[in-house]
Structure formats: structure tokens, C-alpha cells
From Swiss-Prot:
Homodimer. One of its GO terms (cellular component) is cytoplasm. The keyword Chaperone applies. SUPFAM superfamilies: Chaperone J-domain (SSF46565), DnaJ/Hsp40 cysteine-rich domain (SSF57938), HSP40/DnaJ peptide-binding domain (SSF49493). This is Chaperone protein DnaJ 2. It comes from Streptomyces avermitilis (strain ATCC 31267 / DSM 46492 / JCM 5070 / NBRC 14893 / NCIMB 12804 / NRRL 8165 / MA-4680). InterPro entries: DnaJ (IPR012724), DnaJ_C (IPR002939), DnaJ_domain (IPR001623), DnaJ_domain_CS (IPR018253), HSP40/DnaJ_pept-bd (IPR008971), HSP_DnaJ_Cys-rich_dom (IPR001305), HSP_DnaJ_Cys-rich_dom_sf (IPR036410), J_dom_sf (IPR036869). Binds 2 Zn(2+) ions per monomer. Keywords: Chaperone, Cytoplasm, DNA replication, Metal-binding, Repeat, Stress response, Zinc, Zinc-finger.
């Protein structure tokens, strides 16, 4: 026997097919000309290919084990086993380098559709408590005329005569390794294996048409501006009647004339006169839950905040609600009649806050003096 193919692959004579294949893969990675251009390595690569061609084929292996020449029965020659009988191992070469054999067969016309997105505007109270919205969407749907097939009624897709339904065409080229077969998608059917001679007049062969429809969307309480709600299977229908993608509803919360939202809390400002701030009062306020009275305690200062617990936005996850924070702004009068000014001076005098003439103390101002400076814009 001229060549010991078992020794070439480095396996025992009783090695299993799995062991033979693993040995070939390992050597192919090491000795492939693209990895190692040494001429001696190229010869070695041809040897392992010839050995694998024989030992991976049960019939050829049996002839070889009995002392015959299995390659003489292959009907061809070619360098290194890449002759007419050697194409069966080309996928194993590809598998050794890319981890999988080259894909065969036509690709499917049926594919998943694209996702779609639409923006929906809601009011603040709808975001706080949740709501439902009817929305108009326009997406691709299955053509009812051809049921998504793309062919005109009474006709059907035909097997491509160029690739004979394989979806790819092959050609043989010669290299230093011998003959090599390469494949590419069929240019006539774009790799599908079928052609549509008479396209559907409704969808022009696409299998889909655009359609407007109404969907009801449930918007949960607590959604924030920019939140996206996923509606599975409500997006674009895929080519060839494939499954539809998803529809994403993006929430856009409109500004409110009274409240500003910060997370799940709401903020607003109430304005009261200085007398109300000094004496205390109750201020009516329209909240999301209806009319309520905000208790302003005596001595409240401008800029002070009063929380109304549980009057904010519903928590999206978990129970409860945020707070409504009321910010107090105290105003002082800009104009007073003589009687009002007299009374205010009297109050300042009673409180010891009126500044006596000729007794100025740096850094100290009474109530009336501070108010007067405010009136004059100082």
C-alpha cells in the first residue's frame, strides 16, 4: 500500500468516523494554504484531503482496507482528491474553517415583518390614572387578493428554470488545489428557487398592501413621557405572508397649565398676600382629584413648600401615588393709600420694627423699611 491514510490523519485503523472527521478538521485548520503558504504544507494539505476522501466514505474505506485503490473507482482524478469524485468533501473543508457547512437550498420568501412606531399624546390626568385610546395606524397587511402569495388569482409561483428550484447556481474553477466548486444566489429568482410569472395586480407581487386600521391601546397609570408600549404582532406584515412585527406606541405627555411633573410628584405655585402669609389662610386648589383647600399656616414664608401626600402620579410599578408639592409665593403691595400706610406704620411701631430717625443701626431693617425698599425696587 503506497500511502497509509490512517497515519496521514494520525488516527488508529479502528478509529470511528467521528474521530476521523475531527482529525481532518484539526489538520485542515493547520495546513490550509490560506493559513500556511509553505509549498510543503500545501502538499501535506493535499494528502490529508485525499486520506479523508477515502476514510470518510465507507465503500472507499472498505476497498482501501482490503488493499485496493479506492480513488481509481471515483471516475476521475484531480490533484489532492479535488477531482470529479472529490466534491463531496468541499463542505467539510468549509466546515473546518467556518464551523458549519455551506448552506444549501433556496431561501424562503416568508420573513418576519418590520416593527412600527406611532406617537400618542395624552393629558396629565390620563398619565396619572391610566386611560384607553383609539389610534389610527397604517401598516402593511396580507393582500387578500392573492393571500400573500404574490401571484395573480388562478396562477402560482413556478420553479425557476435557471437554478431548477435550488436557489443557487454553481460553477467550477481550477486552482492549484485542483477543481473547486463555488455557488452564488440565482440571479433570476434572487435565491428563492421560484419565480412569479404573473404578479398579483393588487399588490404587484409583493403579497402585501398598505391598510389603515383602528386599534385600542390600554395606557397604564403612571406612564412617563417617552414611554413605549409594545403591541406584539401589530406591526408590518412580513413578505410572503410572514409574521407581523410589533407596534410600539410612544407616549407624549402634554404640558399642564397648573402642574409640572417631576417623576411621580407634581409641583405648583400659589400666590398669597403678605397679610395672609402672616395671619394664615386656606387657599382653594383644583387638584387631579378635585377641589381641595391648602392650609397656609400663620407665618408662612415666601418659597416655603407644602406637601399634599398621595395627590401626585400613580406609581407605574407598585401601589400608591406621588405627592403634590405646593410652593408658596408671598406678594407685597406696590401701592397703598394713606390709611393703609398709616396702619402699616402703626403695626411696625407696635412690633418695634419702625426705624427711629437718627438711630440707624447698620444691618438692621424693620418690617416697614423692608416693604418700602421692595416697593421702590431696591
Amino acid at each position: 500500500m503506497a500511502t497509509d491514510y490512517y497515519a496521514v490523519l494520525g488516527v488508529r485503523r479502528d478509529a470511528s468516523q467521528d474521530e476521523i472527521k475531527k482529525a481532518f478538521r484539526r489538520l485542515a485548520r493547520e495546513l490550509h494554504p490560506d493559513v500556511n503558504p509553505d509549498p510543503k504544507t500545501q502538499e501535506r494539505f493535499k494528502e490529508i484531503n485525499a486520506a479523508y476522501e477515502v476514510l470518510s466514505d465507507p465503500q472507499k474505506k472498505q476497498v482501501y482496507d482490503l488493499g485496493g485503490d479506492p480513488l481509481s473507482q471515483s471516475g476521475g482524478g484531480g490533484a489532492g482528491g479535488f477531482g470529479a469524485g472529490g466534491f463531496g468533501n468541499f463542505s467539510d473543508i468549509m466546515d473546518a474553517f467556518f464551523g458549519t457547512a455551506s448552506q444549501r437550498g433556496p431561501r424562503s420568501r416568508t420573513r418576519r415583518g418590520q416593527d412600527a412606531m406611532i406617537r400618542v399624546e395624552i393629558e396629565l390626568d390620563e398619565a396619572a390614572f391610566g386611560t384607553t385610546k383609539d389610534i389610527q395606524v397604517e401598516t402593511a397587511v396580507v393582500c387578500t387578493t392573492c393571500s400573500g402569495e404574490g401571484a395573480a388569482p388562478g396562477t402560482s409561483a413556478q420553479t425557476c428554470d435557471m437554478c431548477r428550484g435550488r436557489g443557487e447556481v454553481s460553477q467550477v474553477t481550477r486552482s492549484f488545489l485542483g477543481q473547486v466548486m463555488t455557488s452564488r444566489p440565482c440571479p433570476q429568482c434572487q435565491g428563492f428557487g421560484t419565480v412569479v410569472p404573473t404578479p398579483c395586480p393588487e399588490c404587484a407581487g409583493d403579497g402585501r398592501v398598505r391598510s389603515r386600521r383602528t386599534l385600542t391601546v390600554k395606557i397604564p397609570a403612571g406612564v412617563d413621557n417617552g414611554t413605549r408600549i409594545q403591541l406584539a404582532g401589530e406591526g408590518e406584515v412580513g413578505p410572503g405572508g410572514g409574521p407581523a412585527g410589533d407596534l410600539y406606541v410612544e407616549i407624549h405627555e402634554l404640558p399642564h397649565q397648573t402642574f409640572q411633573r417631576r417623576g411621580d410628584d407634581l409641583h405648583c405655585t400659589v400666590t398669597i398676600p403678605m397679610t395672609a402669609a402672616a395671619l394664615g389662610t386656606k387657599v382653594p386648589l383644583e387638584t387631579l382629584d378635585g377641589m381641595e383647600e391648602v392650609d397656609i399656616r400663620p407665618g408662612t414664608q415666601s418659597g416655603q413648600s407644602i406637601p399634599l401626600h398621595g395627590r401626585g402620579i400613580t406609581h407605574l410599578r407598585g401601589g400608591g401615588r406621588g405627592d403634590l408639592i405646593v410652593h408658596v409665593e408671598v406678594t407685597t403691595p406696590t401701592k397703598m393709600d394713606p390709611e393703609q400706610e398709616r396702619l402699616l406704620r402703626e403695626l411696625a411701631k407696635l412690633r418695634g420694627e419702625e426705624r427711629p430717625t437718627g438711630q440707624f443701626q447698620p444691618g438692621q431693617q424693620g418690617l416697614f423699611s423692608r416693604l418700602k425698599d421692595a416697593f421702590n425696587g431696591r
